[in-house]
From Swiss-Prot:
A GO term, aspect molecular function: heparin binding
Coiled-coil residue spans: none
Function statement: Type V collagen is a member of group I collagen (fibrillar forming collagen). It is a minor connective tissue component of nearly ubiquitous distribution. Type V collagen binds to DNA, heparan sulfate, thrombospondin, heparin, and insulin.
Record region (Triple-helical region): 561-1572
Modification sites for 3-hydroxyproline: 682, 688
PTM info: Hydroxylation on proline residues within the sequence motif, GXPG, is most likely to be 4-hydroxy as this fits the requirement for 4-hydroxylation in vertebrates. Sulfated on 40% of tyrosines.
Residues of the signal peptide: 1-36
Protein name: Collagen alpha-1(V) chain
Cellular component GO terms held in the UniProt record: collagen trimer; extracellular matrix; extracellular space
Keywords noted in UniProt: Collagen, Extracellular matrix, Heparin-binding, Hydroxylation, Repeat, Secreted, Signal, Sulfation
Region (Interrupted collagenous region): 446-560
Residues where 4-hydroxyproline is found: 572, 578, 623, 641, 650, 656, 659, 677, 680, 692, 698, 707, 719, 722, 728, 734, 752, 758, 764, 767, 773, 782, 791, 818, 836, 872, 875, 878, 890, 893, 905, 908, 932, 947, 1019, 1022, 1025, 1031, 1223, 1226, 1469, 1472
Listed Pro residues bias regions: 472-487, 689-698, 1108-1117, 1382-1400, 1456-1471, 1528-1543
Length: 1840
């Protein structure tokens, strides 16, 4: 390949540089045209010096030039310039040269993109063109149509429209085109033309634009030359446009007429530079050369060659005339730190530069033309290079040597970015960065020839200043090693879109068809909501706007521009190896859509789709009928720690905890109501048996005496003063289950209790607040096989993937500017079908194809992988009432949760009957005798517990006003779940409205900012107690406190002997007024407010806890395969396994409650002397003693538990309206409201937009019961279940056998209250209890066929302990739920606190054993008795079997006190301490999980407008429309040259492949999915709407049969869905019919690029289509929307108009009127529609034809003036004519000459759309006898 390179830095040439013989050959072989190639000056031929219209003079390239009187002269060209010439004038006597140069000095307007010159043949095909702008294009097309448009040489990274002067030289030689820019930068591109191309000489040359092109060159031009020699381009800066410090030769467009050194004779003749040594190597003698290695692929690098010590031998000696040291005025050098030098630089020798032609090479063909066939380009560059110093020179003389400093300076100023980010560009500078500077060095492309060997060393060059050295270009040197990579350039500016390509091939067959109908399931469309932060609701957008947004989204993804320009040139690296092939280019511009592909084959059954994104909540479902309580489901997985839940119902009593260490003494609590009997104390030593004495008379209450030895239990004394807390006694044996005490008053909220055991699954709670998404959980075990879901809708295009491996084709350059639409070529022969191309990127979502015929059902596919756990589904229809399921086995205990909030106390049960007397226990062994201890005073504080966090002493609160107790309201039915609303601002307080129907609980809104402190409210009920603080300083003894809270019932002690029934005691004295209680819990909810307006849809909440299994959903169509998801959480437990072997017997169950009294046994023999008897029955009360002295006030007791909710107080009067507060924090979630009254059925909503894919539906309900399978093997340990709500109490079990007594342990330090340990293994279940009441309704499942109830499942295996949950805040009290079924008996509760003794009653006589009495009323509290001395703990013996109760033994003597025993076991908890100050507000807890959905209410009110349905399938093809009328007259082209019709043109080049055609029809539906587990008719209301389309009509005949099995309602639903889909499709792609009008013709063309020109309906203002109108759509003209003048406005026939005056408007003529316009049917177009049409248009045009006879319409050729030009009145009342409107031009002006009948066609083509259409015309040249005129008004066309 021969590429000639000429630089201003001359090649050094010495005497031995060129062998004389070779020089002689060069001169002899030079053809004549190479010696005198005459340039043609286009500016001269276009008459620029006479300044035609649109051309003015201006200053040129150099403001001052040496040897010149003034600046260079240039011409400024505006948009008004229209310049062309016949091509014959360019080469009058010869053909257009095959190889030529185009030379120009030009400064284009910044940011413009237009053709500087265009050469057309006779057929109007552009054959040569030069486009200026960013990434300029050289257009070339020879007589064979080569190269095609996609192969036009493009020069990316170069910006010629940066508003600066550029000297541009283009050399076309063989199959290369070389661009030399500003004498420094050279880029070579491959030109794929034929071997002997022909350019027609009979066409025209246009300057500044192309035919029918809107872009017109604007800027300054100084020179434009065509030279029939490709080498002239290399000398442009020497001979044609030298630097400003050099005089200009008198060549074309000379600036200085004085002759200079180019003209030795000074005779002024035109001097044309000859090229004596520029010869084609193929014409020279072929000399053999040494074998050369193939040259590596030239890299894109700027090379500074190493110093060459030998000049090339071929270079002849030529005088040098340029002064390379004087570059300061050269605009091309900008702000360079230019290094002047007197030295000359040597490019690499020929051999190193890789000239391979004419050299025999074993690796290359020797055919001299072979180099021209290779589509590669080698670019030779040589910036600067120094020769080696001659022996006499000093090294320092090398002023031009490239030092590091030089390179650094060059780097700093090297990029002179031509791109100005402030230019008219819609891309921000950050997205683009600077373009490639126009003065950057050469870019390499392609593969060079083989590398030659190094030549012999030459002699130093002899150079005299002023000599012009013209050497032939040296061959390319080997590429250097790659320099360091330059910094990545910023992204280039996005190119304009290219021309539309030809239609593509038919699309591939359509995708596989939808999966077959689901197993009698139904999918309803739900709108897809975007996730993310909750934003405000946006405006409703039309379908077209949403489509535009989707297109914009696609475009945004495609906005990534091509790679930016190359980075700064690195320092020269060593030679690099050849690069591999470039990356594959990006896809070309998309052609028009291809024809629809053939219908694809039926698709196979789709795999289950991957889990889609979670959708927003669906539309509210229809309320279902109330269903029965469902069977108990399997234990679910443990949920994430939720936010603080609502206050739960009281749970069952937990088992007693281990004894804690002794706590610090708390303050005395208020005296509570009488508790149940406490546990028995430790057994005393045997005393002598005394007969029971009669009760003595009541004595006076004395002072507490010294404690005597412990005697038998005496009669109940009066309550003494509160004593100090005694040391805890040893733990006694658990007694039998005590009777349930009477209901206590509701105390204050206690401290949070320890977490209880997990209860059975409670009823679904209300939806909680929406929490933030939690962290990803661990992988759960795989769940059971879910049903196959419908495939989701097609997803949006994914983000760009990472770049693939290098491909073959090079990277696509920057997007070119749009090409101009060529004439339609002759249709080519059909090419062979090419190999299938690689898969393209996903296009935007195509319209859904029509359904294909159903295929045969395929075989059932293999079971898919288990899907991830779905999110809870929407409410389903209620199922039928199922039988009550049996209670499942308890699961393994979960791990301890965090301490939960204390629940509200449960309702106390009725008092139980008294148990029978228990058997007497065996006597324990005697304890070790202790050392006698000193007499003990009142016990001191116990051992200090572990230090707690010290709470500050709380101030005593003021006394509160107790509120009256209100009756509890009845529990309301659960309402339906509503859409979560966004939190509104707090409104002003309104009057309390009547209670509205309860709303559905929405998810918790976001936390608002803390509002300002409100005014003090009425005292609330007591609040929950705070955490226990450290004990405060003991206060003075306080007044007697209120009764303390009721203690928990203790375990029953062994029953004592039956005592005498006492009379009911007198009521005790009224206690003193208590201290003010702390703030109570919130009161009962007020009446519900009226329903608010429906809020906007909230953001999608986090994935809720797994719902109970819903009904099995229908199988969905297969989704596209998504990317593999993250490893999902552990799935739910698997299905029941096979029957396992019988397990080992379980551990012993818990002790049962005591049994009924047995029959009385026979009297046994007297037993051995018994141990000390149990505490006797309460004796009769003694008489009341005198009032004791008022004791010191005791320490303040702890807050009691909150009392029961009081009655609703009367509403107070409405207060004054307060100032508006700040929004408060979100309130607690309200209670589930009652279902609203049934509403009317809503009308069918309008079709909404296609929603994105909804979430996968939840799991369907259990299927029909299968046959009992064998016992499955034990499953793996499941995750811990969530804490269930309290189960219903079960029946009492049989009493268990008494366990053996364990030994008493030593007394331990009192520990902190331990957390409840996990429950032991479950005992065998008790007998089945009676059926309980129905529980609360379950949450509705998703819509499905209701399933028959299955039998109770086998109990699942117990899960492992779950991790402890975070501590939740105290919840609000919930409403009492309806009683659940009876639960299993709970374990014994902890021992209750000792109740105060009651007053003594009178002695009764021995009565007969009565029947079990009713529960007695609560007795008054007794005073605390004195504290006895602490006995020594005995050594516990093993528990014996419970013996028959023996008689009471005699009292034994007290044993001697033993030594201090070790600390006893943990005593019961001390009394609650004082309420501490409120601690700091804790961190917000984790958001709670969304509760289960409440049961469906009755039918609601009419719903809001429905969400848009999915896109319907396209309707059947309409009938062939009537052929439209022919289009309006198009704008005439520029005047062509008259000539005979030419021969038929060559076949046009094939355009780029169009986009893939629409997918073919989907195949038949696949086989039905797996059947639903139950088939029942779906309760669908059979209301008919206008969308009622029989679904069978939408199927092919063969397909209809497969739907016959569906329930009656399915057909209607499918018909409605299909109708919705069709309507949405038509909204997205309007058809231009009266019912489905487009917005404009441009809109219609974008949707249907294949529509022909014709009449269509448009509705610019959208909305209702009733006001649409019919227009003519000119798609050929780019989608113009045309309206026509009415019949009377179409014009007037030619006549002389004798009665009218020139200069008057046509509307003032007798036969005239204002012009008005109508649509294609003759109806006037409304003002509003015209206004919208103008708003939607960027330009408008209208033609007016003036038919004349000797009358001027526009220009008067005789005078050259426009004084008589027609004037127009625009729609905006603006007068327009030649003198004030540049947008009117005469396409044909035959009337200018005033000769005979002629016509003038005026075109108004204006961006000021408000001027069009014209409404009146003024004619100015008529009235003489010989003058006539008429006119025709064309349509007004608007282009978007």
């Amino acid at each position: 390949m021969d590429v000639h390179t000429r630089w201003k830095d001359r090649l050094p040439v010495g005497p031995a540089a060129v062998p004389p013989l070779l020089l002689l050959l060069l001169l002899l072989w030079a053809p004549p045209q190479s010696r005198a190639a005459q340039p043609t000056d286009l500016l001269e031929m276009l008459d620029f010096h006479n300044l035609p219209s649109g051309v003015t003079k201006t200053t040129g390239f150099c403001a001052t030039r040496r040897s010149s009187r003034g600046p260079d002269v240039a011409y400024r060209v505006s948009k008004d310039a229209q310049l062309s010439m016949p091509r014959k004038q360019l080469y009058p006597d010869s053909d257009f040269a095959e190889d030529f140069s185009i030379l120009t000095t030009v400064k284009a307007k910044k940011g413009s993109q237009a053709f500087l010159v265009s050469v057309y043949n006779e057929q109007g095909i552009q054959q040569v063109g030069m486009e200026l702008g960013r990434s300029p294009v050289f257009l070339y097309e020879d007589h064979t149509g080569k190269p095609g448009p996609e192969e036009y040489p493009l020069f990316p990274g170069i910006n010629l429209s940066d508003g600066k002067w550029h000297r541009i030289a283009i050399s076309v030689y063989r199959k290369n085109v070389t661009l030399i820019l500003d004498c420094k930068k050279k880029v070579v591109k491959f030109l794929n033309r034929s071997d002997h191309p022909i350019i027609d000489v009979n066409g025209i040359i246009m300057f500044g634009s192309r035919i029918l092109d809107d872009e017109i060159f604007e800027g300054d031009i100084q020179q434009l030359l065509f030279v029939s020699d490709h080498r002239a381009a290399y000398d442009y800066c020497e001979h044609y446009s030298p630097d400003c410090d050099t005089a200009v030769p008198d060549t074309p467009q000379s600036q200085d007429p004085n002759p200079d050194e180019y003209y030795p004779e000074g005779d002024g003749e035109t001097y044309y530079y000859e090229y004596p040594y520029y010869e084609d190597p193929e014409d020279l003698g072929k000399e053999p050369a040494p074998t050369q290695k193939p040259v590596e692929a030239a890299r894109e690098t700027t090379e500074v060659p190493e110093e060459q010590t030998q000049p090339p031998p071929e270079a002849p000696t030529v005088p040098e005339t340029s002064d390379p040291a004087g570059k300061e005025d050269d605009p091309g050098f900008g702000d360079y730190d230019y290094v002047p030098t007197d030295d000359y630089y040597t490019p690499a020798p020929y051999e190193d530069l890789g000239y391979g032609e004419g050299v025999e090479n074993p690796d290359q063909p020797t055919n001299p033309d072979s180099g021209a066939e290779v589509p590669t380009s080698t670019i030779i560059t040589s910036n600067t290079s120094n020769p080696a110093p001659s022996p006499g020179e000093d090294k320092d003389d090398l002023g031009g040597e490239f030092t590091e400093e030089t390179i650094k300076n060059l780097e700093e100023n090297y990029y002179d970015p031509y791109f100005d980010p402030d230019s008219d560009s819609n891309v921000s500078p950050s997205e683009i960065g600077p373009g490639m500077p126009a003065n950057q060095d050469t870019i390499y492309e392609g593969i060079g020839g083989p590398r030659g060997e190094k030549g012999q060393k030459g002699e130093p060059a002899i150079i005299e200043p002023g000599m012009l050295i013209e050497g032939p270009p040296g061959p390319e040197g080997p590429a250097g090693l790659p320099g360091p990579p330059g910094t990545t350039g910023p992204t280039g500016q996005v190119g304009d879109p290219g021309e539309r390509g030809p239609p593509g091939r038919p699309g591939l067959p359509g995708a596989d068809g939808l999966p077959g109908p689901p197993g009698t399931m139904l999918m309803l469309p739900f709108r897809f909501g975007g996730g993310g932060d909750a934003g405000s609701k946006g405006p409703m957008v039309s379908a077209q706007e949403s489509q535009a947004q989707a297109i914009l989204q696609q475009a945004r993804l495609a906005l990534r521009g091509p790679a930016g320009p190359m980075g700064l040139t690195g320092r020269p690296g060593p030679m690099g190896p050849p690069g591999s092939g470039g990356l594959k280019g990006e896809p070309g511009d998309m052609g028009p859509q291809g024809p629809r592909g053939v219908q694809g084959p039926p698709g196979p059954t789709g795999k289950p789709g991957r889990r889609g994104r979670a959708g927003s909540d669906g539309a509210r479902g229809m309320p279902g009928q109330t269903g029965p309580k469902g069977d108990r489901g399997f234990d679910g997985l443990a949920g994430l720690p939720g936010e603080k839940g609502h206050r739960g119902d009281p749970g069952p009593s937990g088992p007693p905890g281990l004894p804690g260490d002794d706590g610090e003494r708390g303050d005395d609590g208020e005296v509570g109501p009488r508790g149940l009997p406490g546990e028995p104390g430790p057994r005393g030593l045997l005393g002598p048996k005394g007969p029971p004495g009669p009760p003595g008379p009541p004595g006076v209450t004395g002072m507490d005496g010294q404690p005597g030895p412990k005697g038998n239990v005496g009669p109940q004394g009066e309550p003494g003063p509160p004593g100090q807390q005694g040391n805890p006694g040893a733990q006694g044996l658990p007694g039998p289950q005590g009777a349930i005490g009477p209901p206590g008053e509701k105390g204050p909220l206690g401290k949070p209790g320890l977490p209880g055991m997990p209860g059975a699954d409670g009823p679904p709670g209300h939806p909680g607040k929406e929490g933030p998404p939690g962290e990803k959980g661990g992988q759960g075990p795989p769940g059971p096989q879910g049903p196959i879901g419908y495939p989701g809708p097609r997803g949006v295009k994914g983000a760009d993937g990472i770049r693939g491996l290098k491909g073959t084709k090079g990277e696509k350059g920057e997007d070119g500017f749009p090409g101009f639409k060529g004439d339609m070529g002759i249709k080519g022969d059909r090419g062979e079908i090419g190999p299938p191309g690689p898969r393209g990127e996903d296009g935007p979502e195509g319209p859904k194809g029509r359904g294909g015929p159903n295929g045969d059902p395929g075989p059932l596919g293999p079971t898919g992988e288990k899907g991830k756990l779905g999110v809870p589904g929407l409410p389903g229809y209620p199922g039928r009432q199922g039988p009550k399921g049996s209670i499942g086995f308890p699961g393994f205990p979960g791990a301890n949760g965090e301490k939960g909030g204390r629940g509200t106390p449960g309702k106390p049960g009725p008092r139980g009957q008294r148990g029978p007397t228990g058997p007497r226990g065996e006597r324990g062994p005697r304890g070790i005798t202790g050392k006698p201890g000193p007499k003990g005073n009142s016990g001191g504080d116990g051992p200090a517990g572990p230090p707690g966090e010290r709470g500050p002493n709380g101030p005593q609160g003021p006394t509160g006003f107790p509120g009256p107790k209100g009756p509890p309201g009845p529990p309301g039915k659960d309402g339906l779940p509503g859409h979560p609303g966004q939190r509104g601002e707090t409104g002003f307080q309104g009057k309390t409205g009547p209670p509205g129907p309860p709303g559905v609980v929405g998810p918790q809104g976001p936390t608002g900012e803390t509002g300002p402190m409100g005014e003090r409210g009425h005292p609330g009920p007591p609040g929950p107690p705070g955490e226990q603080g450290l004990p405060g300083v003991a206060g003075k003894e306080g007044t007697k406190g209120d009764p303390g809270p009721a203690g928990l019932p203790g375990k029953d002690g062994p029953p004592g002997l039956r005592g005498f029934p006492g009379d009911r005691g007198l009521p005790g004295p009224v206690g003193a007024l208590g201290l003010k209680g702390s703030e109570g819990p919130p009161g009962p909810p007020g009446p519900a407010g009226s329903p608010g307006e429906r809020g906007p849809a909230g953001a999608a909440g986090p994935i809720g806890i797994p719902g109970r299994p819903g009904p099995q959903g229908p199988p969905g169509p297969a989704g596209e395969k998504g990317v593999p998801g993250e490893k999902g959480p552990q799935g739910p437990a698997g299905r029941d396994g096979l029957q396992g072997p019988v397990g080992l017997p379980g551990p012993a169950g818990p002790v049962g409650p005591p049994g009924e009294d047995g029959d009385k046994g026979e009297i046994g023999e007297p037993g051995q002397k018994g141990s000390k008897g149990d505490k006797g029955e309460q004796g009769p009360p003694g008489p009341t003693g005198p009032q004791g002295p008022i004791g010191q006030p005791g320490p303040s007791g702890a807050d009691g538990e909150p009392g029961p909710r009081g009655q609703q107080g009367l509403f107070g009067q409405k207060g004054d309206e307060g100032s508006r507060g700040f929004p408060g924090p979100p309130g607690p979630v309200g209670l589930q409201g009652l279902p609203g009254p049934p509403g009317e059925k809503g009308e069918t909503g309008d079709v909404g937009q296609m929603g994105p894919p909804g979430p996968p539906g939840p799991r369907g309900p259990s299927g029909a019961p299968g046959a009992d399978g064998p016992q499955g093997p034990p499953g793996g340990i499941g995750n811990p279940g969530a804490v269930g709500e309290k189960g219903e109490p079960g029946e009492a079990g049989e009493p268990g056998l008494p366990g053996e007594g364990g030994p008493l342990g030593p007394k331990g330090e009192r520990g902190e209250k331990g957390e409840v340990g996990p429950s032991g293994a479950a005992g065998p279940p008790g007998p089945k209890g009676p059926p309980g009441d129905d529980g609360p309704k379950g949450s509705p499942g998703p819509v499905g066929f209701p399933g028959d109830p299955g039998p109770p499942g086998e109990p699942g295996p117990a899960g492992q302990d779950g991790p402890p949950g975070d501590k939740g805040d105290d919840g609000e009290p919930g409403q009492t739920g309806s009683p659940g079924p009876t639960g299993e008996p709970g374990p014994s509760g902890p021992p209750g606190k000792r109740g105060p003794p009651g007053p003594a009653g009178p002695e009764g006589r021995q009565g007969e054993k009565g029947a079990k009495g009713e529960a007695g009323l609560e007795g008054p509290p007794g005073k605390t008795g004195p504290i006895g001395p602490q006995g020594a703990p005995g050594k516990p013996g093993p528990d014996g079997l419970r013996g028959i109760p023996g008689p009471v033994g005699e009292q034994g003597l007290p044993g001697s006190p033993g030594p201090d025993g070790p600390p006893g076991p943990m005593g019961p908890p001390g009394l609650p301490g004082l309420k501490g100050d409120s601690g700091p507000k804790g961190e917000k807890g984790h958001p709670g999980l969304i509760g289960l959905i409440g049961p469906p209410g009755e039918q609601g009110e009419k719903g809001d407008r429905g969400l848009p349905g999915p896109q319907g399938s396209s309707g059947p093809k309409g009938e062939q429309g009537i052929t439209g009328p022919s289009g309006p007259l198009g704008p005439p082209g520029p005047p062509g040259l008259p000539g005979p019709p030419g021969p038929k043109g060559a076949k046009g080049s094939s355009g780029p492949t169009g986009p893939k055609g629409e997918a073919g029809h989907p195949g038949l539906p696949g086989p039905p999915g797996p059947p639903g587990e139950v088939i029942q008719p779906l309760p669908i209301q059979a209301s008919r709407t206008r969308r009622n389309i029989d679904a069978s009509q939408l199927l092919d005949d063969g397909a209809g049969e497969s739907y016959l099995d569906y329930a009656d309602g399915m057909e209607e639903i499918f018909g409605s869905l299909n109708s919705l889909k069709l309507e949405i499709e038509q909204m997205k792609r309007p058809l231009g019919t009266q019912q489905n009008p487009a917005r404009t013709c441009k809109d219609l063309q974008l949707c249907h690029p294949d529509f022909p020109d014709g009449e269509y309906w448009v509705d610019p203002n959208q909305g209702c289509s009733r006001d649409s109108f019919k227009v003519y759509c000119n798609f050929t003209a780019g989608g113009s929307t045309c309206v026509f003048p009415d019949k009377k406005s179409e014009g007037a026939r030619i006549t002389s108009w004798p009665k009218e005056n020139p200069g008057s408007w046509f509307s003032e003529f007798k036969r005239g009127k204002l012009l008005s316009y109508v649509d294609a049917e003759g109806n006037p177009v409304g003002v509003v529609q015209m206004t919208f049409l103008r708003l939607l248009s960027a330009s408008a045009h209208q033609n007016i034809t003036y038919n004349c006879y000797q009358s001027v319409a526009w220009q008067d050729a005789a005078t050259g003036s426009y004084d008589k030009a027609i004037r127009f009145l625009g729609s905006n009342d603006e007068e327009m004519s030649y003198d004030n409107n540049p947008y009117i031009r005469a396409l044909v002006d035959g009337c200018a000459t005033k000769k005979g009948y002629q016509k003038t066609v005026l075109e108004i083509d204006t961006p000021k759309v408000e001027q069009v259409p014209i409404v009146d015309i003024m004619f100015n040249d008529f009235g003489e006898a010989s003058q006539k005129f008429g006119f025709e008004v064309g349509p007004a066309c608007f282009l978007g």
